Amino acid sequence: MAGKGGKGLLAAKTTAAKAAADKDKDRKKAPVSRSSRAGIQFPVGRIHRQLKGRVSANGRVGATAAVYTAAILEYLTAEVLELAGNASKDLKVKRITPRHLQLAIRGDEELDTLIKGTIAGGGVIPHIHKSLINKTAKE
């Protein structure tokens, strides 16, 4: 009889463990955003919704298209902000203005070709033609 009692105790423990495991299965996991899964800051879900609204093929957009688009936008934003931050630091100012963005974008050849439009409040890039420079100032 002593042997049977031990088995019964073991069986009771396993059923309790199974019940606890079933209880864990019933619990819902916290939702994880697609942005955090991809390891980026830009909102993948919002970009996916925007892409679906703009496409003409019945709103069909692949799941990875939004992730790639968000990653590209995040990279370009970080690049522009880094250059604009350097421009504002050179001018000893703590706030980035449209002028700093203009100087950063026009100073980089690749960003200049990518962003050809006018930046409101950006001013103009300083440039003096060689023929206008005084000959005495050259020497």
Curated annotation (Swiss-Prot):
User: Known InterPro entries for this protein?
Assistant: Histone-fold (IPR009072), Histone_H2A (IPR002119), Histone_H2A/H2B/H3 (IPR007125), Histone_H2A_C (IPR032454)
How does the annotation summarize its subunit structure?
The nucleosome is a histone octamer containing two molecules each of H2A, H2B, H3 and H4 assembled in one H3-H4 heterotetramer and two H2A-H2B heterodimers. The octamer wraps approximately 147 bp of DNA.
Q: What is this protein called?
A: Probable histone H2A variant 2
Q: What does this protein do?
A: Variant histones H2A are synthesized throughout the cell cycle and are very different from classical S-phase regulated H2A. May replace conventional H2A in a subset of nucleosomes. Nucleosomes wrap and compact DNA into chromatin, limiting DNA accessibility to the cellular machineries which require DNA as a template. Histones thereby play a central role in transcription regulation, DNA repair, DNA replication and chromosomal stability. DNA accessibility is regulated via a complex set of post-translational modifications of histones, also called histone code, and nucleosome remodeling.
**GO molecular function, one example?**
structural constituent of chromatin
Identify the Gene3D superfamilies for this entry: Histone, subunit A
What organism, scientifically named, is this protein from? Answer: Oryza sativa subsp. japonica (Rice)
The region called Disordered is annotated at 1-40
